[in-house]
């Protein structure tokens, strides 16, 4: 099966591009927007619409394979690739990539994806968002050629012989950490709520007292609203380094506090993402490693999730090799090609580390569907309900795709 044409269409994402540097410099709020001047190159507003590019590969039998290029909310910040605007990058795909795809015979996913993921133009690698979308489209093309799901393609190439099963779906609330939890309970999210605990004084509490109260509220709310006794979601709270900030990155003090949270969460299991941020990769690994060892030594029913300083496949391997946490977030679309997601999850699994197939609120329904297939095929511990920050939409997209894949795979057994 050959690719006979490549089309690119501009699109919207499930959220927004925010100029992180402008926000950190004190951009003001005005309703849902920000006031003040932009700082990061490419931004025309501090908050502007999130943009995507759909890549459509027309196959010689008339089928169309589809992947979406998308970037994170804080595109252009923190050493990332430039702000991802469709008008800037559609010409790159049409000029540099499409000619290499048109006329190509579709073979296996892995070698084709790796070729385009590693491709350079004028000595530079392609934008991560382009690598993300192109490799999604290639995966869909291979699946359409073989007349199977994308999950089966990934399973056969990366995880041969494995069963394709449902994976727990993780919903995140953003700042609306009370009303959105009610939505999650009604729809029975498997993992919840994220909660966006990114400020010590306002959200964690100077001694952690505010988050402790929230965990107690969360526990009681689930018990009150659940319609069946055996609905027992995992608590996954992202604290953005605030526990380390409140407790001076003291391992024993942080462990004491997390132990208190774990007790308050019972009968539910607790995960804490990003307990500290020590602003250095090596030191971050060591702090996560030592805190995990302390919690495990005490037998605390809590897991740590690595986030800060764990961005690339190499970072994932580094944290995994050193047992720096119990789980790592596999960050899409920062990894570029979706082949890297499969590689990262399989490495985690082979080395006793939990793999969370994550992502961003600022991607699309299509990229969410594709990465859900990959998470299922590789046996991730959880997948993110995405895109958007409304809970309902992301859960619908991810859960429905999962159920479709399970039905199609089951039919072929």
From Swiss-Prot:
Enzyme class: lyase
EC number(s) recorded for this UniProt protein: 4.3.1.2
Gene3D superfamilies: Enolase-like C-terminal domain (3.20.20.120), Enolase-like, N-terminal domain (3.30.390.10)
Pathway named in the protein's UniProt entry: Amino-acid degradation; L-glutamate degradation via mesaconate pathway; acetate and pyruvate from L-glutamate: step 2/4
UniProt-listed Pfam families: MAAL_C, MAAL_N
Resulting phenotype, residue 331 to H: It abolishes deaminase and aminase activities and does not show any major conformational changes
Active site: 331 (proton acceptor)
Temperature and activity: Optimum temperature is 55 degrees Celsius. It retains only half of its original activity after a 30 minutes incubation period at 50 degrees Celsius.
Substitution effect: residue 194 to R: It abolishes deaminase and aminase activities and does not show any major conformational changes
InterPro entries: Enolase-like_C_sf, Enolase-like_N, Me_Asp_am_lyase, MeAsp_NH4-lyase_C, MeAsp_NH4-lyase_N
Annotated effect of mutating residue 331 to R: It abolishes deaminase and aminase activities and does not show any major conformational changes
pH dependence per the UniProt record: Optimum pH is 9.7.
Any one of the GO BP annotations: glutamate catabolic process via L-citramalate
Residues binding (2S,3S)-3-methyl-L-aspartate: 172, 329, 360-361
Activity regulation note: Inhibited by calcium ions.
Binding site residues for Mg(2+): 238, 273, 307
Record has Magnesium as a keyword: yes
Catalytic activity entry: (2S,3S)-3-methyl-L-aspartate = mesaconate + NH4(+)
Official protein name in the record: Methylaspartate ammonia-lyase
Organism: Clostridium tetanomorphum
């Amino acid at each position: 099966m050959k690719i006979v044409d490549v089309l690119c269409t501009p699109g919207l994402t499930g959220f927004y591009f925010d100029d992180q540097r402008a926000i950190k410099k004190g951009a003001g709020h005005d309703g849902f927007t920000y006031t003040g001047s932009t700082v990061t190159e490419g931004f025309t507003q501090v908050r502007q619409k999130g943009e995507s590019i759909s890549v459509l590969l027309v196959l010689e039998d008339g089928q169309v394979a589809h992947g979406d290029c998308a970037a994170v909310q804080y595109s252009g910040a923190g050493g990332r690739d430039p702000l991802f605007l469709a008008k800037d990058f559609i010409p790159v795909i049409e000029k540099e990539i499409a000619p290499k795809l048109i006329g190509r015979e579709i073979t296996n996913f892995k070698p084709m994806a790796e070729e385009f993921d590693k491709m350079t133009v004028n000595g530079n690698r392609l934008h991560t968002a382009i690598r993300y979308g192109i490799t999604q489209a290639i995966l869909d093309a291979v699946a359409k050629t073989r007349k199977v799901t994308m999950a089966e393609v990934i399973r056969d190439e990366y995880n041969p012989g494995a069963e394709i099963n449902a994976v727990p779906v993780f919903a995140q609330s953003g700042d609306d950490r009370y009303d959105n939890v009610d939505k999650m309970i009604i729809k029975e999210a498997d993992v919840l709520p994220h909660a966006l605990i990114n400020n010590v004084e306002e959200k964690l509490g100077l001694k952690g007292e505010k988050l402790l109260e929230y965990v107690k509220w969360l526990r009681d709310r689930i018990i009150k609203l659940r319609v069946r006794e055996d609905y027992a979601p995992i608590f996954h709270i992202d604290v953005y380094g605030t526990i380390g900030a409140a407790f001076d990155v003291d391992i024993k003090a942080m462990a004491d506090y997390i132990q208190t949270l774990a007790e308050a969460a019972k009968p539910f299991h607790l995960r804490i993402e990003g307990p500290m941020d020590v602003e250095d990769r090596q030191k971050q690994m060591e702090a996560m490693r030592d805190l995990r060892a302390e919690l495990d030594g005490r037998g605390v029913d809590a897991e740590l999730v690595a986030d800060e300083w764990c961005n690339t496949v190499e970072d994932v391997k580094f944290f995994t090799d050193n047992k720096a946490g119990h789980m790592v977030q596999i960050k899409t679309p920062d990894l570029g090609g979706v082949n890297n997601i499969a590689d990262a999850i399989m490495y985690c699994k082979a080395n006793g580390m939990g793999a969370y197939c994550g992502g961003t609120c600022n991607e699309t329904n299509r990229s969410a569907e594709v990465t859900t297939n990959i998470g299922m095929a590789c046996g991730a511990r959880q997948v993110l309900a995405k895109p958007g920050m409304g809970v309902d939409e992301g859960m619908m997209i991810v859960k429905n795709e999962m159920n479709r894949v399970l039905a199609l795979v089951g039919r072929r057994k």
